[in-house]
A protein has these predicted regions:
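PRPP/pyrophosphate-binding module of the type I phosphoribosyltransferase fold
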Residues: 12, 22, 27, 32, ...
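The short coil/loop that forms the "turn" connecting the two helices of the helix-turn-helix
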Residues: 13-14, 133
């Protein structure tokens, strides 16, 4: 969210020049202790945008905690899969994962976060919320409520033995967008490759992939 200098000047009854000096100091302090990034937008309609972050120390502790949870023997499912639903449905854990992923892409000028329905949606939403950008949902089945869509075929399955189709509403993504793909699961990479193909159809650019 962009907050204008006028807002600060009126609230604290200070000159905008003084506010600007304070922002420089605060920006430096926030980056030093790794709690967030302050972006300054110049011009008549300018102001500042604060993007929260997480310190390297806190991120490491959270990752270790997640690793311990994921290592629990009762999480192993038939086929070698790992049960994740309880973690991805816990708001505090989901928020922290979103902050950790977003931290790695904070300087990448992300315009949107993309995921595929349905289990990747909460995670993508958490990342998009920290980056303060929209998130778009790719679907494997066509829904009339999506309006006009763009579709691509992609190879599904670790053995590459199935051809499936995915859809994205034409209104979901602007041409030229830099997009971060986020998903909760990776097997053969077919779904991610399908989303990358969709980005090409929208003349958009892949900024990164986080799984």
């Amino acid at each position: 969210k962009l907050t204008s200098l006028n807002t600060f000047a009126e609230k604290y009854e200070s000159a905008k020049s003084s506010i600007s000096e304070d922002i420089v100091i605060i920006k430096r302090a926030f980056e030093e202790i790794e709690i967030g990034h302050i972006q300054t937008v110049t011009g008549a309609g300018g102001g500042v945008i604060f993007t929260p972050s997480i310190s390297s120390h806190d991120a490491k502790e959270m990752v270790e905690d997640l690793r311990a949870k994921l290592s629990e023997s009762d999480r192993i499912l038939p086929g070698g899969y790992i049960y994740l639903s309880d973690l991805l449905s816990t708001p505090a854990i989901l928020k922290n994962i979103g902050r950790i992923i977003a931290k790695s892409f904070m300087d990448q000028k992300i315009d949107a976060v993309m995921t595929v329905a349905t289990k990747g949606v909460p995670l993508a939403n958490a990342v998009a919320n920290v980056l303060n950008v929209p998130f778009v949902i790719v679907r494997r089945d066509l829904k009339i409520t999506e309006g006009s869509t763009v579709s691509v075929n992609y190879v599904s399955g670790s053995s590459g033995d199935r051809i499936e189709k995915m859809f994205l509403s034409k209104r979901s993504l602007k041409a030229g967008s830099r997009v971060l793909i986020v998903d909760d699961f990776l097997k053969g990479g077919g779904t991610v490759n399908g989303m990358i193909s969709l980005l090409r159809e929208f003349d958009s650019e892949l900024a990164g992939v986080a799984v």
